[in-house]
């Protein structure tokens, strides 16, 4: 008989590969990501006006794609121009600085192509340590943030998360729905054999066309509590999310985007409650603090409860009060969440932050981490994992 379920949330910061730009200092990375997003947006224009062409050339210059289409072997290159059909640019041969490059395509119909971010493979020890975090947390259901895609996540679990007694995958149920992020930073879920997914629903299309609410998605994953438990046959819904980042600056547009995402997630949650679903978890990386205006619709204006209020609660640092979930775990870095509906909060019997996969400080000495992490680049993630136990007896 299943007497307890453990649920976790973990931003793995990609499993096998990650955009090279994200390894740069934040101002550099933010500029590259903005240029990448904007130039692809301009490519979709029906007509390339002189102003559009001028902006394209400036963005391609910032991405170092004026003189050629990019070369992944050059460590200073962060993007590649993919050209499938037609011609976008005229590049004179004797033009070392690219000042003579022109846009010759008249609009979207004249050519097919886009700009991709170059990805680098993640350190092998970091990958192994990511698996170790998930194994040691020991959750039955894990909400995953920043996974490349379903096949990558399945390959990760099938090779690194095996039952030592049977050699079977600990998490045979793996799902990632491709979201709205072009960089391959999606959200997904893992579950054990005792908790197969009953159904799922995506929210990638919430909002008007061209103005999607969610940066990735807010998928609903539905499960049934197992036979023999106190909640046998009843439904459990897990919502996984990754709100707009503060990366590159917390400007008013960024705050407004997160608030809109928070409000939409709250609306999805409230609709489920109205439909009679009692047992709901909302989790993920919300990229803002509990006192932020952006998260108010979700944290204040619903009856969801943060697991930080569950007792006993282990913050992952035996010596300090460390409520944060990112980096050094300070109060201002509490950006990851695991929220419970009232019925689940009433059954919660313990929760915590698992930060042994995080480096912590300049020298990795702020709090205990795995002995297999000998340098910062070997850390599993900059994010700690969150977990909660729910009594099913």
What are the roles of these predicted feature ranges?
Residues 149-151, 181-186, 246-248, 287-293, ...:
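Active-site environment of divalent metal-dependent phosphoester hydrolases
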């Amino acid at each position: 008989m299943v007497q307890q379920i453990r649920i976790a949330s973990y931003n793995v910061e990609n499993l096998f590969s990650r955009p090279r730009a994200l390894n740069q200092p934040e101002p550099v990375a933010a500029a590259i990501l903005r240029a990448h997003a904007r130039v692809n947006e301009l490519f979709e224009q029906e007509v390339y006006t002189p102003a559009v062409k001028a902006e394209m050339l400036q963005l391609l210059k910032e991405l170092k794609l004026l003189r050629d289409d990019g070369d992944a072997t050059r460590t200073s290159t962060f993007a590649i121009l993919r050209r499938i059909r037609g011609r976008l640019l005229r590049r004179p041969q004797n033009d070392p600085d690219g000042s003579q490059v022109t846009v010759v395509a008249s609009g979207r119909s004249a050519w097919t192509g886009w700009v991709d971010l170059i990805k680098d493979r993640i350190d092998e020890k970091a990958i192994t340590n990511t698996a170790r975090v998930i194994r040691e947390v020991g959750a039955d259901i894990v909400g995953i943030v920043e996974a490349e895609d379903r096949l990558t996540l399945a390959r990760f679990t099938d090779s690194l998360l095996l039952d030592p007694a049977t050699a079977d995958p600990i998490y045979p149920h793996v799902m990632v729905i491709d979201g709205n992020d072009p960089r391959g930073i999606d959200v997904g879920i893992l579950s054990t054999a005792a908790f197969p997914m009953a159904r799922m629903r995506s929210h990638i299309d919430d909002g008007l066309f061209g103005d999607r609410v969610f940066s990735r998605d807010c998928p609903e994953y539905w499960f049934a509590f197992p036979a023999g438990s106190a909640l046998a046959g009843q439904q459990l819904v897990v919502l996984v999310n990754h709100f707009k980042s503060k990366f590159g600056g917390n400007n008013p547009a960024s705050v407004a985007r997160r608030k809109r995402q928070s409000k939409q997630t709250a609306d999805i949650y409230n609709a489920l409650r109205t439909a009679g679903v009692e047992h709901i978890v909302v989790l993920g990386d919300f990229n803002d603090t509990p006192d932020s205006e952006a998260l108010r619709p979700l944290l204040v204006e619903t009856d969801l409860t943060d697991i930080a209020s569950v007792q006993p609660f282990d913050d992952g640092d035996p010596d300090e009060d460390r409520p944060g979930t990112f980096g050094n775990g300070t109060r201002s870095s509490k950006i990851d969440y695991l929220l419970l509906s009232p019925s689940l909060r009433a059954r919660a019997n313990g929760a915590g932050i698992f930060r042994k996969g995080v480096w912590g400080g300049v020298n990795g000495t702020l709090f205990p981490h795995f002995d297999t992490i000998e340098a910062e680049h070997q850390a599993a993630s900059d994010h700690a994992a969150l977990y909660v136990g729910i009594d099913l007896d």
